[in-house]
UniProtKB/Swiss-Prot annotation:
Residues 81-120, 190-258 are annotated as: Disordered. Plays an essential role in embryogenesis. Residues 228-246 have a biased composition (Basic residues). The gene is rsp-3. One of its GO terms (cellular component) is nuclear speck. This is Probable splicing factor, arginine/serine-rich 3. Keywords: Developmental protein, mRNA processing, mRNA splicing, Nucleus, Phosphoprotein, Repeat, RNA-binding. Residues 247-258 have a biased composition (Low complexity). It comes from Caenorhabditis elegans. The keyword RNA-binding applies.
């Protein structure tokens, strides 16, 4: 896409409060440049918005400064709508996060900051049947219809992985986006299959049971040497003290009737 095109000037803003107002979104970004429009999408779960600036450089500044910004108790996500971002020599994006078709899921993106830590939840679906030109950003855009996407990646074989911020969105994605028409940024289309990744540890109401099971062995290992001997000694001491107290009280009770 030519430099300065509309996608270069447009940013996605995720994890907004469901009742956010246009003026509030404008207040977050107004100091970075003149805003052409704000389009808020709300419904199930957190709201999100698209903000278009008049100058692509203002959009770049907004992504750098506001991704991860805390608003109304939430950490919002700000990224380019097509992963365009600032470019270096030869027109290559400075934010590495394009289509990682090397065979493994090793470079998917969850936010707009290049190289930043990715927020992972385990609330994951597997997407199969993606066209060869489908990128992680194409997949992320498609799956946003089901909820707030925090991570997406695409492998060489046309399989994708997507993580949502809520488990309810996983169920909704399987129900509503399975066997839907997917379009890549190059216009290539395919019907995709979407299924829950039950091996991710994020299922069954949020994955709390899986994660608690994974923590419990470590907790037991930490607790056993520290507390078990102390508890056993303290119980033995308490029993011995109770016996000594009972022994000391028994003589005092015997002479009482006179």
């Amino acid at each position: 896409m030519p430099r300065g095109g509309s996608e270069d000037q447009k940013v996605y803003v995720g994890n907004l409060p469901g009742d956010v107002r246009e003026k509030e979104v404008e207040d977050i970004f107004h100091k970075y440049g003149r805003i052409k429009y704000v389009d808020i999408k709300s419904g199930r779960g957190p709201a999100f918005a698209f903000v278009e600036f008049e100058d692509h450089r203002d959009a770049e500044d907004a992504v750098r400064a506001r991704d991860g910004y805390e608003f109304d108790g939430r950490r919002i996500r700000v990224e380019f709508t097509r992963g365009v971002g600032p470019r270096g020599p030869g027109g290559r994006p400075l934010q590495d996060g394009g289509d990682h078709r090397g065979g493994d899921f090793r470079g998917g993106r969850g936010g707009g900051r290049g190289g930043g830590p990715q927020r992972r939840t385990g609330y994951r679906v597997i997407v199969e049947g993606l066209p060869p030109t489908g990128s992680w950003q194409d997949l992320k855009d498609h799956m946003r219809d089901a909820g707030d996407v925090c991570y997406a990646d695409v492998a060489r074989d046309g399989t994708g992985v997507v993580e949502f911020t809520r488990y309810e969105d996983v169920k909704y994605a399987v129900r509503k986006l399975d066997d839907t028409k997917f379009r890549s940024h190059e216009g290539e289309t395919a019907y995709i299959r979407v299924r829950e990744d039950n091996s991710s540890g994020g299922g069954s109401g949020g994955g709390g049971r899986d994660r608690s099971r994974s923590r419990s062995p470590r907790a037991e290992r930490r607790a056993s040497p520290k507390y078990s001997p102390r508890r056993s000694r303290s119980r033995s001491r308490s029993r011995s003290r109770s016996r000594s107290r009972s022994a000391s009280r028994s003589p005092s009770r015997s002479p009482s009737p006179q």
